[in-house]
Amino acid sequence: MRGAASASVREPTPLPGRGAPRTKPRAGRGPTVGTPATLALPARGRPRSRNGLASKGQRGAAPTGPGHRALPSRDTALPQERNKKLEAVGTGIEPKAMSQGLVTFGDVAVDFSQEEWEWLNPIQRNLYRKVMLENYRNLASLGLCVSKPDVISSLEQGKEPWTVKRKMTRAWCPDLKAVWKIKELPLKKDFCEGKLSQAVITERLTSYNLEYSLLGEHWDYDALFETQPGLVTIKNLAVDFRQQLHPAQKNFCKNGIWENNSDLGSAGHCVAKPDLVSLLEQEKEPWMVKRELTGSLFSGQRSVHETQELFPKQDSYAEGVTDRTSNTKLDCSSFRENWDSDYVFGRKLAVGQETQFRQEPITHNKTLSKERERTYNKSGRWFYLDDSEEKVHNRDSIKNFQKSSVVIKQTGIYAGKKLFKCNECKKTFTQSSSLTVHQRIHTGEKPYKCNECGKAFSDGSSFARHQRCHTGKKPYECIECGKAFIQNTSLIRHWRYYHTGEKPFDCIDCGKAFSDHIGLNQHRRIHTGEKPYKCDVCHKSFRYGSSLTVHQRIHTGEKPYECDVCRKAFSHHASLTQHQRVHSGEKPFKCKECGKAFRQNIHLASHLRIHTGEKPFECAECGKSFSISSQLATHQRIHTGEKPYECKVCSKAFTQKAHLAQHQKTHTGEKPYECKECGKAFSQTTHLIQHQRVHTGEKPYKCMECGKAFGDNSSCTQHQRLHTGQRPYECIECGKAFKTKSSLICHRRSHTGEKPYECSVCGKAFSHRQSLSVHQRIHSGKKPYECKECRKTFIQIGHLNQHKRVHTGERSYNYKKSRKVFRQTAHLAHHQRIHTGESSTCPSLPSTSNPVDLFPKFLWNPSSLPSP
């Protein structure tokens, strides 16, 4: 096969380190016209043109003429002869070219290898992108592009163009004649392992042309297609191995098969991507390729395939079952676009083994019987022909190997079955390597460790992506907004979410759509209830790994996100973003009902329940409902008695974190909230708001019984207990009940004798803060309460109220026995002692014969006292 076609290979002048240019102008193609910007490639490499660009007739000189910009090469010391072989990136499309023949995208496209692309500087890369995209748009506007080429899709997505793998788009013709040139490879030390020698593996890889992909370098597509009746398929080039190879050997094979398939795809003579190539693209093992014969593949050509009977023979080096398939000779025109991509040819040759297979046709589409399938599953071996039918395979005998012969690895289990099962969770995998990586989840093994931060990973790909965090490398850039990403998947998600709005992944339970499968998988855990991420400290489980990471910072105390304004730190980036709105004043979430704006969306959602009256969170103990789940959680602590927030100074505990923060200000004396009217400061915003109503006169809380209004809700609630008689706070010592909790606290100090509030001037102590405040006015001389009738001032509002009765003549305190009426309770109390016989003297009064007559007068008119 190779010998027959070798005569058509021309011997071009090769570039150093690579093969020669592999294309020349096709007959009938019109000349191309240069665009205003043409790229000069670096001297180290060259682009690989498809159809006529920089062909033999154009390689004499670099592009010249007006509008051509030759970018500087990195290696200016290279010989001038090499610089002459630089090729232009794109060519413009003129109407006159249409008369000489249709122009395709392949006529104006240039490919780069990875090595060549890395030698381009950023200016050259940007120019390449612009020219290629402009050429495609010009062709599309003329209707010359039926579908978007992969290289354009990659450029639009910000990918590097050398990553493009061409999909097979045309007929796969099985009767092609392979033409390649054998190129010797340098021997590498310790290249082989086991029983494979250096000489054997190097000779085999060389004969199959796997290092430099010589088919792509030395093949003249146009000349071949015009002169040869048959075409080359990937099955003529692909090599399968049934013995475990060294990683270096695997790279040799993978790169070669990959590039050969890419070359055939660029020629446009393939119908679908082979399974072998798909597996290599997915970083899977090529021996996992499975073949399953299906029904009729082509209309008009029914009996085009013949399967081969298997002849068993034990082999000590590998396991599995071999099958082989042959094709009848067909022209390209006999194939259609509905080629079954699952039926892909491959060749399974054991390196160093001398094996050949005999051909014995059976009925088309005949599948393996269940009995034979069980036999294959049970034995799990490779079956070969008799020794008498084996042939020695050297470089010449490989050429004699029938081009239609294919040896396929079958395991007795059809495609779609998963072969490797995890013993821990029973999850199955199609590759042993995938199972190995998965098992590290159970063992906790993380063999890949970052030298920068010490973080470890269970697989190499995650480790490679992580390292970009330290290097800052973001190779994937969005062509719309210019945003760059560390991972290609992040770019795709960004592209769908912000630019295209595409959501191709639908939830089968609720129909919700997502832009990537990761979001869908996370969403489905809501339906399944799965929480696979568990905290090692408190054993709390989470649906998402990110939620676990944030939760673990509660235990570690880590707060990596710091505000640039106030230096406050947060454990979550979202919390920092919300906090920064406090400084900026931004409130992006607005209520459509009342126009009130909020900093967080969750606050808006809670606010909307005020309008709807919805209270979906109900306490199971008392049946009380709440509009916010956090309110329910706080309320439930009343029933459980839990007080998780404790003050480190006085050890006082609270049910809410906000209450602890308010309490801590009593120790620090901090009062950050100041009234702009009078300058009075407060430790809480709620106290400031209540105080400001004193100036505005606003009293939004109204009693439904008597209509009395109050400036704060707590005062209104306490007032309503006058009507209901409710006294919910009872002293456990004496059983006395009170309307307010603060009254109970003050009362309990009468039993304990505690007086925590001490005057800093005279040292006098009080059991209540208000008593201390009133006492301090004695030292300061402040009398804030003034009578509007006589302008007399008083220290306490109670004294003012008593004084007002002098003007009104009101006597509110009546003694039932004597029916005597008094203006003040003190007068009434003293009068009662007359009837009880209890002695009472005032230490500040002078000694008189009738202190009873003097004392009431002294209380309301101290000036009437005689001088001592």
Swiss-Prot record:
Alphabetized SMART domains for the sequence: KRAB, ZnF_C2H2
Subcellular locations according to the entry: Nucleus
Gene: ZFP28
Keyword Transcription carried by entry: yes
PROSITE patterns in the record: KRAB, ZINC_FINGER_C2H2_1, ZINC_FINGER_C2H2_2
SUPFAM superfamilies per the UniProt record, alphabetical: beta-beta-alpha zinc fingers, KRAB domain (Kruppel-associated box)
Sample GO molecular function, one term: zinc ion binding
Annotated protein name in UniProt: Zinc finger protein 28 homolog
